[in-house]
Regions:
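Bacterial N-terminal signal peptides
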Residues: 7-19
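OB-fold and OB-like single-stranded nucleic-acid-recognition modules
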Residues: 22-120
Length: 120
């Protein structure tokens, strides 16, 4: 019984450290939707052009932005396509407006992320 418990613990640690627990490889994806700030959307449902000024201020303070997909209402947290780089300012400037973002989609637990490889 002790061997089984130790084996299970070692396997769990291996999976956690190997990244296998994070799901499949990233998938290329293009999504069209509204650029939102995650705080105000999550806490108050704030979105649209009427929330644009506040959303821009939140993004400037470092609150992550996301893309609210048209038709499905899926929220993709937007990530830079290179480590330690910001999301492009031109995309942040589309706060409250429509944008199309192409990149790689990652799903971790119940969260969805999308790198910003290009946008329009």
């Amino acid at each position: 019984m002790i061997r089984l418990t130790i084996s299970a613990a070692v396997a769990g640690i291996y999976l956690a450290l190997s990244g296998a627990a994070f799901g499949a490889d990233p998938v290329p994806l293009t999504v069209t939707g509204e650029v939102i700030d995650t705080f105000c959307y999550a806490t108050a449902g704030a979105r649209g052009e009427g929330h644009r000024t506040c959303g821009l201020a939140c993004a400037e303070k470092g609150i992550p932005i996301a893309l609210l997909e048209n038709d499905t209402d899926k929220v993709y947290v937007l990530l830079p396509n290179k480590n330690a780089q910001p999301v492009p300012k031109g995309l942040v400037a589309k706060m409250g407006l429509q944008a199309t973002v192409a990149g790689k989609s990652y799903r971790v637990g119940g969260s969805q992320f999308l790198t910003v490889d290009s946008f329009k």
